[in-house]
From Swiss-Prot:
The lineage of its organism: Bacteria, Bacillati, Bacillota, Clostridia, Eubacteriales. The RecF protein is involved in DNA metabolism; it is required for DNA replication and normal SOS inducibility. RecF binds preferentially to single-stranded, linear DNA. It also seems to bind ATP. It is found in: Cytoplasm. It comes from Clostridium botulinum (strain Eklund 17B / Type B). This is DNA replication and repair protein RecF. The gene is recF. It holds the Pfam family SMC_N.
Amino acid sequence: MYIKAIMLANYRNYNNLELNLSEGVNVFIGDNAQGKTNVLESIYYCAFAKSHRTSRDKDLINWKENEAYISLLVGKKRLDKRIDIKILRDGKKAIKVNSIKINKIGELFGTFNVVMFSPEDLKIIKESPGIRRKFLDMELCQISKKYYFNLVQYNKILNERNVILRSRDFNKDILEVYDLQLVECADYIVKERLEYIDKINYYGKFIHNEITSGKEDIVFKYDSGIKFKDDFKYAFLEKLKNNLLRDREQGITSIGPHRDDFNVLINNIDVKKFGSQGQQRTAVLTMKFSSLKIIKEITKEYPILLLDDVLSELDINRKRYVLSTLNDIQTIITCTGINDLEDYLDDKSKVFKVCNGEIVN
């Protein structure tokens, strides 16, 4: 799959942008704060109906305007897809795929797939479990609508369970009904996450080995607060029962997929706690490029690769690995110059100079 064309109107600092993209490498160069990342953000938004930089959609609208527009034409093996999104200042959005209105965000997932790699992705390793859960959830949602709908349902039931826990008129019988529903969704979520981690381990072993010239081994381990061998549902129900007193005191559900995490080990050392910044960056790179392989395995097409100002952050080995993988993958890169890229550009590649929200060449 690849993006054939992109159109932006009143999106951040772009009043009007219309571009035809290459199936291969597309490079947006320019000084900082000129609008390079805004192009990548708009593409990401069309895949997930949300920005990777802000939770406030109104931030995406040019400050002089009341609405912004994004339109993508995506080429796929079977059928081209046109995605049109209108973002309103009141927080609402209207999404159409091939002129058909999308009523639920989950219906958008999988229309086309992206993998983004940016300097902020170091947070996946360095910061809280919530960021690592978000990584897993976003990757799984774009390849499985069933995962998305189970996740939405789980969070809905979880919120309702927490309301019951805090209620003065606490009813244990009602709580047990919610527990059974919660366990059903959780069972699916955890099993899908475990399978995804297994796939990252499979592909990540080869990717990490190539980046480090065989000097390091990497392992990803899912960390669930629910210990089980075969019957996850039973184990989770027992945990909910055992934690009931504490959950009532705190007014929250203290265990479940919403509290899970995963650990990254390089040569049996916890990378979050003891890894160097270079090792942490390599771990993220391994995760992201494993996701490329996983999406290709499942959808039979490579996703679009978005590289947001990361090349300057990578040492020569990591940079060489990234640039050597660009064959057969539409890649959209932002950077301040193309010196590092010249050997990897061909006749199909396109380079766009960005200056204050305009393409100047």
